[in-house]
């Protein structure tokens, strides 16, 4: 009577559930490097870290560089090779930007984990992994920590260095206090070159059977500005959109630009032409229409910067003045000022140059 619910049926259900979970997983996680050999274009860091696998003598580390260059992926790949998937659960503490980063979290959560006695590995883990006698605390986006929290962290690093190693990850190394940075081995993660990034995007699109028009992957890379994580996410979002359009539909550059919130080139040229006219009423009218269409003023600032600064038709003095106006507007937008007013002010001032 209950034959259909035997062990074989349960295994099939479990396998199906695992496949569905993998299919729904973000591609950023699905294609994250599983070991150091899979880390792309960070040869120096990978070479040095591979040596630690042989000696199991790991220093405190500071990974810094632009977003989406593999900093977090590299330390996670290293910990997998050091401990294996099972022991990692008890040996690794990872805190990221979603966690409280003040002095209290350092004094409580970080300190409590750092002082724990290292658990004994299983026989299986010892046979297959180095399993060094220390834990690792990964602090992602450490440059967002307050100076007081960083000072408290320095004392914790000194006290528990016998049983705990720290890996600090940040975009801006200058925001890490010197007493903390001096206790770490620094690894600079450079922005991925175009060929490596394109190869990775092409590999993922082939694995996922995603079809793209010519130049789409290059456009994704251009929009993501070297951030491979953002590029992979954008590729996945575009693939979902193409699926809804029906079988055989390719991802187009237009779809990618719409998903990324990029202002289309023809609209950007219209803005430039309105600025050239120098007519305040025309500029004001166009800005009103533009903002009602839902475009972002920040995107316009970035694209105007690219248009004017890379254009050889403008002299150096004009570019200097444009750069200052764009910098001022970008700063004000980041401080939360009104987008409509700032965009209007920017375009009017450019028209007066």
Swiss-Prot record:
Signal peptide start-end: none
Predominant place of localization: nucleus
Disulphide connectivity of cysteines: none
GO CC field: Ctf18 RFC-like complex; DNA replication factor C complex; Elg1 RFC-like complex; nucleus; Rad17 RFC-like complex
Keywords assigned by UniProt, alphabetized: Acetylation, ATP-binding, Cell cycle, DNA replication, DNA-binding, Nucleotide-binding, Nucleus
GO molecular function: ATP binding; ATP hydrolysis activity; DNA binding
BP term (GO), one: mitotic sister chromatid cohesion
Subunit structure: Replication factor C (RFC) is a heteropentamer of subunits RFC1, RFC2, RFC3, RFC4 and RFC5 and forms a complex with POL30/PCNA in the presence of ATP. Component of the RAD24-RFC complex which consists of RAD14, RFC2, RFC3, RFC4 and RFC5 and associates with the checkpoint clamp DDC1:MEC3:RAD17 complex. Component of the ELG1-RFC complex which consists of ELG1, RFC2, RFC3, RFC4 and RFC5. Component of the CTF18-RFC complex, which consists of CTF18, CTF8, DCC1, RFC2, RFC3, RFC4 and RFC5. RFC2 interacts with ECO1.
Further information: Present with 4610 molecules/cell in log phase SD medium.
Annotated family: Belongs to the activator 1 small subunits family.
Name of protein: Replication factor C subunit 2
Organism encoding this protein: Saccharomyces cerevisiae (strain ATCC 204508 / S288c)
Gene it is expressed from: RFC2
């Amino acid at each position: 009577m209950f034959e259909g619910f035997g062990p074989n049926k349960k295994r099939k259900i479990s396998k199906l559930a695992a496949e569905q979970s993998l299919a729904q997983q973000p591609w950023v996680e699905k294609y994250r490097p599983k070991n150091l050999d899979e880390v792309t274009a960070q040869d120096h860091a990978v070479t040095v870290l591979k040596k630690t696998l042989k000696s199991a003598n790991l220093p405190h580390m500071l990974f810094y560089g632009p977003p989406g260059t593999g900093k977090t992926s590299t330390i996670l790949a290293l910990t997998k090779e050091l401990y294996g998937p099972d022991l990692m659960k008890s040996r690794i503490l990872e805190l990221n930007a979603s966690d409280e980063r003040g002095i209290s979290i350092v004094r409580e959560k970080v300190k409590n984990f750092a002082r724990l006695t290292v658990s004994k590995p299983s026989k299986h883990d010892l046979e297959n992994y180095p399993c060094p006698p220390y834990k690792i605390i990964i602090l992602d986006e450490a440059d967002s920590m307050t100076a007081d929290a960083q000072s408290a962290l320095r004392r914790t690093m000194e006290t528990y260095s016998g049983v705990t190693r720290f890996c600090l990850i940040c975009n801006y190394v200058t925001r890490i206090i010197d007493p903390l940075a001096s206790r770490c081995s620094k690894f600079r993660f450079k922005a991925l070159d175009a060929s490596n990034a394109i190869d990775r995007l092409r590999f993922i699109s082939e694995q996922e059977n995603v079809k793209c028009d010519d130049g789409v992957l290059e456009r994704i890379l251009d929009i993501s500005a070297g951030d491979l994580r953002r590029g992979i996410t954008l590729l996945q979002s575009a693939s979902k959109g193409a699926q809804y359009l029906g079988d055989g539909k390719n991802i187009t550059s237009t779809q990618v630009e719409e998903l990324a919130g990029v202002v289309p080139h023809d609209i950007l040229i219209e803005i430039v032409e309105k600025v050239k006219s120098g007519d305040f009423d025309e500029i004001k009218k166009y800005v009103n229409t533009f903002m009602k269409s839902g475009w972002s003023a920040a995107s316009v600032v970035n694209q105007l910067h690219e248009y004017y600064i890379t254009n050889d038709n403008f002299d150096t003095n004009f570019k200097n003045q444009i750069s200052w106006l764009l910098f001022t507007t970008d700063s004000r937008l980041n401080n939360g000022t009104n987008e409509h007013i700032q965009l209007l002010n920017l375009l009017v001032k450019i028209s007066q140059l």
